[in-house]
From Swiss-Prot:
Its EC number is 2.6.1.37. Involved in phosphonate degradation. Homodimer. Coiled coil: none annotated. This is 2-aminoethylphosphonate--pyruvate transaminase. It comes from Bacillus cereus (strain 03BB102). The modification N6-(pyridoxal phosphate)lysine is found at K194. It catalyses: (2-aminoethyl)phosphonate + pyruvate = phosphonoacetaldehyde + L-alanine. The lineage of its organism: Bacteria, Bacillati, Bacillota, Bacilli, Bacillales. It comes from the Bacteria.
């Protein structure tokens, strides 16, 4: 077991560095000028990670989990007479549908199997047939399985039909290179505790300025009013409307500096990619097969199908935890799977130690 207590092989919360943890040992004031300046630096750094055309975009930080930020977008961006098309092939796409329904937003769904990417042909057919659709939403990396969805094609199609594009990049932003201006993404949502390698406590929305300005007065919630949150941060030098997670913001700023030190998003992607390939190859040697086809597989998290025989996931989980690892159960309904993530402060030697623990018969006799 490491000094981190457990190595989290999960898609977030994840294993953070010692230095990210250490900055949370101090207390901070939400009204402090230096703290607000840090918030502004965080906002600017996120835009620069997202696109070269920085002047067209802005960042809104939102308290809570990433789901809070997704709901802030759904509830603030779509007008009362709007209609949302959601591309879904997993739990997080379904969650967007549920949000829309609870907010009384007209919604239509393009659904594929959980191990298949979004069907572009079906999406275009829906857009051709339903002229009332105003917005289209897609999850980039659906961590239900680890599949990557074709956001380039979805957003291109959305703009071809004049729609506002919403991308849930919760588990991909900072770990997979994305230029939101090139992809014509209007609103991208992610979270502090994913590929940037911070800790849970806030999410963020990188928004196309002109589209964000249209959201004034549209929010269906006070605390999740995306426009009002942005206007306060923008006009009051990084101030949050309500109490902000000061420790989490400091940890996130440190994580951003460490991302830069590592070599940026491309370098981090390469580490994640190599982790994932090593994981699949080593697990294959001991009889575990991945659920998702290699060409659709993300470098973020991998779903493995239960092997034949007397396999007990809970035994696997408990034994691995004894040896200092935490993994994820499966989240799909039609196939028995479990999931192993390889993002966070995770390296080749960690993947090898994990698989060695399994291969030695610790878990599987």
């Amino acid at each position: 077991m490491t000094e981190n207590h457990y190595l989290l092989l999960t898609p977030g919360p994840l294993t953070t560095t010692k230095t990210v943890k250490e900055v949370m040992l101090y207390d901070w004031c939400t009204w402090d000028v230096e703290y607000n300046m840090m918030v502004q630096k965080v906002r600017a750094k996120l835009v620069s990670l997202a696109t070269k055309e920085e002047e067209k975009y802005t960042t809104v930080l939102m308290q809570g989990s990433g789901t809070f930020s997704v709901e802030a977008v759904i509830g603030s961006v779509i007008p009362k007479n709007g209609k949302l098309l959601v591309c879904t092939n997993g739990a997080y796409g379904k969650r967007i549908v549920q949000m829309a329904e609870m907010l009384h937003i007209d919604v239509v769904v393009s659904q594929t199997e959980e191990w298949e990417p979004t069907n572009i042909v079906e999406v275009e057919k829906i857009l051709q047939q339903d002229k009332e659709i105003t917005h289209i939403a897609v999850v980039h990396c659906e961590t239900t399985t680890g599949i990557i969805n074709p956001i380039v094609d979805v957003c291109k199609l959305g703009k071809q039909y004049g729609k506002v594009t919403l991308v849930d990049a919760m588990s991909s932003f900072g770990g997979i290179e994305i230029d939101i201006a090139e992809l014509q993404i209007d609103f991208l949502i992610s979270s502090a505790n994913k590929c940037i390698q911070g800790v849970p406590g806030f999410g963020f929305v990188i928004a196309q300025r002109d589209e964000l300005l249209k959201c004034k007065g549209q929010a269906r919630s006070l605390s999740l009013d995306l426009y009002d949150q942005w206007e306060t941060m923008e006009n009051q030098n990084g101030k949050w409307r309500f109490t902000s997670p000061t420790h989490v913001v400091h940890a996130f700023y440190q994580a951003l500096l460490e991302l830069e030190k590592e070599g940026g998003v491309r370098a981090r992607y390469n580490r994640y990619y190599n982790n994932q390939k090593l994981l699949v190859n080593r697990m294959g040697e001991i009889g575990f097969k991945p659920l998702v086809n290699e060409k659709y597989q993300s470098p973020i998290i991998t779903s493995f199908i239960y092997p034949e025989g007397n396999f007990e996931f809970q035994q696997l989980y408990n034994e691995l935890k004894r040896y200092g690892f935490v993994i994820y159960p499966g989240k799909i309904s039609k196939v028995d799977t479990f999931r192993i993530g390889n993002i966070g402060d995770v390296h080749e030697e960690d993947i090898n130690r994990l698989v060695d623990s399994i291969a030695k018969g610790v878990v599987i006799g």
